[in-house]
Amino acid sequence: MNIFEMLRIDERLRLKIYKDTEGYYTIGIGHLLTKSPSLNAAKSELDKAIGRNCNGVITKDEAEKLFNQDVDAAVRGILRNAKLKPVYDSLDAVRRCALINMVFQMGETGVAGFTNSLRMLQQKRWDEAAVNLAKSIWYNQTPNRAKRVITTFRTGTWDAYKNL
């Protein structure tokens, strides 16, 4: 298991524009196109991102390219963020993937707002961090994914992603 496999489970591949859990137009493996309510705006963003007229549909290869760019952007966001980088640096490889997963979903600014949980993670207080993360709006909005990510933080294993 790695971050790419983890996110493929949590995001799934969709080759046609869809609305995510927050109602935002998305495509591929969790690639946010726009927060605009306009489907035409989403199609325009997609055409720019891919470099051709897509009419709201992309190939698997195009989805993979966007996905790789998005994972790279999430990691870069963590490394440049003064609140996230020290936490990331303190984590083992599996737990780093859990943090990348959160940033992929919510953005670096969103995750940086988890001040208490981040402090607990940096201090390796896994059980307390898990309890705290489960009290979040994020947990209520995407409970299945949040449970898997939280279990990954708590255990430092891929157990939550086995057999999925």
Swiss-Prot record:
Coiled coil: none annotated. Optimum pH is 7.3. It catalyses: Hydrolysis of (1->4)-beta-linkages between N-acetylmuramic acid and N-acetyl-D-glucosamine residues in a peptidoglycan and between N-acetyl-D-glucosamine residues in chitodextrins. Keywords: Antimicrobial, Bacteriolytic enzyme, Cytolysis, Glycosidase, Host cell lysis by virus, Host cytoplasm, Hydrolase, Viral release from host cell. The active site is at E11 (proton donor/acceptor), D20 (proton donor/acceptor). InterPro entries: Endolysin_T4_type, Glyco_hydro_24, Lysozyme-like_dom_sf, Lysozyme_dom_sf, Phage_lysozyme-like, T4-type_lysozyme. Induction: Expressed late in the viral replication. Substrate binds at L32, F104, S117, N132. Changing D20 to E/Q: Loss of 99% of enzymatic activity. Endolysin with lysozyme activity that degrades host peptidoglycans and participates with the holin and spanin proteins in the sequential events which lead to the programmed host cell lysis releasing the mature viral particles. Once the holin has permeabilized the host cell membrane, the endolysin can reach the periplasm and break down the peptidoglycan layer. HAMAP family: ENDOLYSIN_T4 (MF_04110). Belongs to the glycosyl hydrolase 24 family. This is Endolysin. The lineage of its organism: Viruses, Duplodnaviria, Heunggongvirae, Uroviricota, Caudoviricetes. The gene is E.
